[in-house]
């Protein structure tokens, strides 16, 4: 029964659409209908400004980090922890507050793995930032992160988390499917074009 509580808690917390709330409260816009129509930090930053994008990023990371860290204090069972982590990320992608729609889950995945495999996450974030800096495409950086995460999770010794990391890779590619299509057609928005 306690497992069910933790899964529901993680899913509920993951479902909270902080980006949507920030957009409505801070810049009076529905980010689901403007820009990339994503509720993530990138779209918040584009529409509302950098500081609000950072706020959305931190909150989305926290909703992955907090339930996993709390659950880890309850049990070190890797299956249990993986399920809690997955519930938080799935909550972000399929939010009960947005008719089972949501964001792309990069920030929430980062939060989950900062709690479980911080070194692997750090290295993966370095690749994410490097690709964004070089290419100008946040989506390309996110996809690079998705590929790097299982690799660094394995090589840094967090072997028990590799299946979860692989699952997150598949999910992140799925949530970025439209970005992948736009990248292939040369139609993806680049931060560099804004300068």
UniProtKB/Swiss-Prot annotation:
<keyword id="KW-0594">Phospholipid biosynthesis</keyword>
<keyword id="KW-0808">Transferase</keyword>
<comment type="subunit">
    <text>Probably interacts with PlsX.</text>
</comment>
<comment type="similarity">
    <text>Belongs to the PlsY family.</text>
</comment>
<dbReference type="InterPro" id="IPR003811">
    <property type="entry name" value="G3P_acylTferase_PlsY"/>
</dbReference>
<comment type="pathway">
    <text>Lipid metabolism; phospholipid metabolism.</text>
</comment>
<keyword id="KW-0997">Cell inner membrane</keyword>
<keyword id="KW-0472">Membrane</keyword>
<dbReference type="GO" id="GO:0008654">
    <property type="term" value="P:phospholipid biosynthetic process"/>
</dbReference>
<keyword id="KW-1003">Cell membrane</keyword>
<keyword id="KW-1208">Phospholipid metabolism</keyword>
<keyword id="KW-0812">Transmembrane</keyword>
<keyword id="KW-0444">Lipid biosynthesis</keyword>
<dbReference type="GO" id="GO:0043772">
    <property type="term" value="F:acyl-phosphate glycerol-3-phosphate acyltransferase activity"/>
</dbReference>
<dbReference type="Pfam" id="PF02660">
    <property type="entry name" value="G3P_acyltransf"/>
</dbReference>
<feature type="transmembrane region" description="Helical">
    <location>
        <begin position="145"/>
        <end position="165"/>
    </location>
</feature>
<protein>
    <recommendedName>
        <fullName>Glycerol-3-phosphate acyltransferase</fullName>
        <ecNumber>2.3.1.275</ecNumber>
    </recommendedName>
</protein>
<feature type="transmembrane region" description="Helical">
    <location>
        <begin position="112"/>
        <end position="132"/>
    </location>
</feature>
<feature type="transmembrane region" description="Helical">
    <location>
        <begin position="2"/>
        <end position="22"/>
    </location>
</feature>
<comment type="function">
    <text>Catalyzes the transfer of an acyl group from acyl-phosphate (acyl-PO(4)) to glycerol-3-phosphate (G3P) to form lysophosphatidic acid (LPA). This enzyme utilizes acyl-phosphate as fatty acyl donor, but not acyl-CoA or acyl-ACP.</text>
</comment>
<feature type="transmembrane region" description="Helical">
    <location>
        <begin position="78"/>
        <end position="98"/>
    </location>
</feature>
<keyword id="KW-0443">Lipid metabolism</keyword>
<keyword id="KW-1133">Transmembrane helix</keyword>
<feature type="transmembrane region" description="Helical">
    <location>
        <begin position="52"/>
        <end position="72"/>
    </location>
</feature>
<dbReference type="GO" id="GO:0005886">
    <property type="term" value="C:plasma membrane"/>
</dbReference>
